[in-house]
């Protein structure tokens, strides 16, 4: 009974997990969605600002509350991510699990991903999109707006050190965001990059504190004549890079069988389409260069940089390793 209760708790907390196939349809034509995403971003922000202004003069928490109604995860009924996933106006690739690199996944490799209902309830395989040349999952916006918000609150409001914030993110990814056999069985460093960049986005809205990469992009919103106003438009091209792409920032499988299945799928893709690459990373030089901007020292007993907590250090798809960030 105790084990069933534990299973149920982990399962319930894992329901926001979905996985992305960054390979199967990668080389099919797909229109860049960055322009429409940016346009809708600023429209949603203006609508949230209008609602917040109706609650009083420049009330900060009211503003965040209204923005969070739109910029949130699907399970919290975030309206923008629901639009991204479902709207025909936003170009995307839809891939069923049976056609994906996870088609050999067994229940014991990742329950949420391998169960029959995975293709029907949106918790299994997510959609993929071309954002300014980066082939990313729609789930990365959920990570930016969901986990990114929690990173932001922990660092800028609760006084967590950045190392502690990143540790919490590592634990969440392992325990209930995919990286265990009860969830999807896939540990995704690219999600951690999205979380971190989401923290930057939330901070830049009002410029609550210094940017951790030293790039002050905000404030996007300011109090003008006792009312909130969008004074600068958001451009998510400032945040999204190759670190979001799971064909560059390689994922880890939590079981040997899950890893064998993914490698088998990639081998089949290579045989079917030998003129294109189906490996990770697709471009070693690019992911190495992108990683450099995150190499900001975070101190502490173990030292290291933020990049150590955000990027797969082995530069390949492999079985999950405990304490991988300390390698």
Regions inferred by a protein language model and the residue ranges of each:
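Sec-dependent N-terminal signal peptides
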Residues: 4-12
């Amino acid at each position: 009974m105790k084990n069933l209760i534990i299973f149920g708790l982990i399962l319930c907390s894992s329901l926001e997990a979905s996985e992305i196939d960054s390979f199967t349809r990668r080389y099919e034509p797909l229109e860049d969605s960055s322009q429409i995403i940016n346009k809708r971003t600023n429209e949603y922000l203006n609508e949230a600002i209008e609602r917040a202004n109706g609650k009083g003069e420049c009330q900060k928490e009211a503003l965040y509350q209204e923005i969070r109604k739109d910029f949130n995860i699907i399970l919290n009924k975030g309206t923008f991510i629901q639009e991204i996933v479902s709207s025909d106006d936003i170009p995307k690739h839809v891939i069923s699990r049976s056609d994906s690199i996870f088609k050999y996944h067994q229940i014991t490799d990742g329950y949420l991903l391998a169960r029959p209902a995975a293709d029907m309830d949106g918790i299994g395989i997510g959609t993929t999109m071309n954002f300014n040349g980066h082939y990313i999952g729609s789930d990365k916006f959920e990570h930016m707006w969901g986990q990114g918000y929690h990173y932001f609150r922990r660092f800028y409001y609760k006084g967590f050190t950045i190392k502690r914030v990143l540790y919490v993110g590592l634990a969440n990814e392992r325990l209930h965001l995919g990286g265990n056999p009860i969830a999807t069985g896939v540990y995704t460093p690219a999600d951690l990059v999205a979380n971190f960049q989401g923290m930057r986005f939330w901070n830049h809205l009002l410029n609550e504190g210094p940017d951790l990469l030293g790039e002050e992009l905000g404030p996007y919103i300011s109090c003008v004549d006792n009312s909130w106003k969008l004074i600068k438009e958001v451009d998510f091209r400032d945040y999204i890079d190759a670190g979001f792409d799971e064909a560059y920032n390689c994922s880890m499988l939590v079981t040997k069988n899950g890893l064998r299945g993914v490698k088998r799928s990639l081998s089949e893709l290579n045989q079917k389409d030998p003129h294109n690459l189906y490996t990770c990373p697709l471009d070693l030089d690019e992911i190495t260069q992108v990683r450099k901007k995150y190499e900001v020292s975070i101190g502490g007993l173990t030292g290291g940089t933020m990049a150590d907590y955000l990027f797969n250090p082995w530069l390949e798809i492999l079985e999950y390793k405990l304490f991988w960030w300390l390698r």
